[in-house]
Amino acid sequence: MTKGKVDALLGIVFGDEGKGKVVDFFTPRYDVVARFAGGPNAGHTIIFDGKKFVLRSIPSGIFDEGKTNIIGNGCVMAPDLFMAEARELEAAGYDIAPRLHISRRAHLILPTHRVLDRAYEAAKGKNKVGTTGKGIGPAYSDKAARVGLRVGDIEENFEEKYRALKARHEQILRDLHYTDYDIAEEEKLWMEGVEYMRRFKLSNTEAEINRALAEGKSVLAEGAQGSLLDIDHGTYPFVSSSSTTAGGVCTGLGVAPNTIDRVFGIFKAYSTRVGSGPFPVELFDETGETLRRIGHEYGAVTGRNRRCGWIDLVALKYAIMINGVTDLVMMKGDVLDEFETIKVCTAYKKGDEVVTEMPYDTEGYEAVYEELPGWQTPLTEIREEKDFPPAFSAYIAYLEKQLAVRISIVSVGPDREATIIR
């Protein structure tokens, strides 16, 4: 029997690339869909059977009863938020418990992690990262410090373990002079979520995935956020706390590097970023506001305005390199329909220095642009590549030449049918 392979589907910039729609498009082709990193800080918006769902922790293959869905060891979970997300799916008629397996090695986000998140951000003042306040960073900090609680801990002597870690957090909060909080109601709901999680299959998911591969089954590793938010390779310290790149697939699921076949890198036809941190292509003018308005650039979980700018080839080349991207997926081409001229960032400049490779720190750099003609033709109803306006085809060809990777899929609208395979 031919051994199965893992394909990775990754956002390769700052997240919010439209992974949810693409995952929904991809999932019928795979037997297993697995989340390998992150937690309820990022949402994938899925339209299924005419209904809108925002999935934060649950993999996007959950709507298909024939799929196995896995929350891998590289993820962090908030039981109360997981319960709310799962109950919404159950209320819509989906029997998700038989389809969803949760790694015992995934770490838990405690209510006090969320308080710590707020306390740390407050202490940073103007240097704050701009976290979602979901407790992600403190949970991963405890993981690295080897004091965290894992999903497997809820199976035995959990109350004792919980109280010990909670006491540790409370001492840290006292040291930070951050004492104005009350988690009594939140903690009650959280404990209800812990009990709810016990309904699901808590397992050694790395063994499950490798058994599936040995049986010739196909696995889709569903990324969260984006490569430039990776804890190692992102715009540190304005990053997430997990490994969001292709390397994170191996560590976050327990699969070997040689099991990875194709790496699909998702990006938008322009650039966005949420929260703090350097963003050389950011537009503060009417063009930036137009991109935000047409692209509906507001966070799926937080509702925060996304910062907008032209496409950034310096960032994309870097992300393609560190991920080994084999196929590119371009989203939201239709958002650029109105523009007479489209700019493309090909380099960064600081004083007399011009760089075309991603610097150690992009703070203080400005974008250097080339200009291309716009197509000024609506793309949303187009379903075949042969019907693309010539200027849009030229834009795609230009990007492929610059990035040296084929753009295999182009999205020109929110509907699934507006996803065109080339």
Predicted segments, located by residue:
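Non-transmembrane, aqueous-exposed alpha-helical and coiled segments at domain scale
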Residues: M1-R422
